[in-house]
């Protein structure tokens, strides 16, 4: 077990470094660098386009689950698009069938899209079903966190400004009093972007780990004693 853990150390260091950098960049991007006004508590109001830390970790994990190589990166990148698109159908269609407070439209579309993603696995080995579910879940989760826009009328907020945040009619239903209220189109774009970043992080982590892996020492071959017979 000790040898196995020792063998994982280069990858562990690489993942730790990249995880720190991604988390630091994503949170600063969302709450300090690209924003729409001062919230008065040391943080800023996130713009409609923002970065979501956990989404990248989902795709990063799927990269390793798919094999952790270039082929895995392709599989997960494709799966991200299919899964996110399937979730967007739910986001858009649920409110068309039945909006707040009826959940049956959400449940129905989730069932249909989940079944469809499984069936599409028959297209070939390139269609990695687990990653499609990871992408689907990421979009769906962020939709809930950001106010269930379209299903909940005005749930994604209106105007995305500090002034709009101060009015219950325009603040939206997102977490933290509407701070992360987001329209469904941006929910889709933001999560898909972060899922793609997760694939890149996976590829970078394997390459960085290779740099940290000690090179095997060359084996020294001793010269035969002088006068010995050579077979």
Residue ranges and their predicted role:
Residues 1-14:
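N-terminal membrane topogenic signal
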Residues 1-3, 18-44, 62-74, 86-100, ...:
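Short juxtamembrane and helix-loop transition motifs at transmembrane-helix boundaries
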Residues 15-28, 80, 84-96, 110-122, ...:
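Transmembrane alpha-helical segments of multi-pass membrane transport proteins and ion-pumping complexes
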Residues 16, 20, 31-68, 111-117, ...:
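Pore- and pathway-forming membrane helices of multi-pass small-molecule/ion transporters and channels
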Residues 72-77, 153-154, 191-192:
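Short, tandemly repeated low-complexity microdomains enriched for cysteine and small residues
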Residues 73-82, 103-108, 127-136:
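Cytoplasmic-side transmembrane-helix entry/capping segments in multi-pass membrane proteins
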Residues 176-201:
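Individual transmembrane alpha-helices with interfacial aromatic-anchor signatures
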Residues 211-231:
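Short, highly charged, low-complexity non-transmembrane loops/tails of multi-pass membrane proteins
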